[in-house]
Amino acid sequence: GCFDCFLLAGRYTLLDQTSLEKLMPICENNNISLILGGVFNSGILINPSPESYFDYTKLDSNWFENLTKSLVRIPKDHESAEFWLNKANSIKNACESFDTTLKKAAIQFPYFNRTVSSCILGMNSSNQVIENIDDYNRKLPSSFWQHLKDNKLIDERSKII
């Protein structure tokens, strides 16, 4: 084929796996790898709060309208700031119950899918480089990933082993 990889931002993350619907199967069937950007979904997967951003848009009461105007993507009717914050906080609570961090889970999750060849992580210091390497290398137990799937916190089609 004419493509060997694509860069995908924010659509195959611990929070949002919408690329499983169409893009991932196309890539898999055509031996196209994905390089993922935005694995922290604009920061919500570091520290979910009403001050967080998702899809480069602040998660306040105007999130839906502001995202629509930004042309990053058109949100679906069920989406709202509350929807995404609740989901992120539910995943964060699951992380805490397994004595881990949301950031560590967000770094490890994409690599279970064999279509993903690499992830681009935003960092601004050498300490963050070291932390991210450590977060990747300290593997979370399969029971954690199964818990996320069993509780519908990640798409059932997500690869977790």
Language-model region placement:
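Beta/alpha (TIM)-barrel catalytic core signal, keyed to glycine-rich beta->alpha loops juxtaposed to Asp/Glu
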Residues: G1-I160
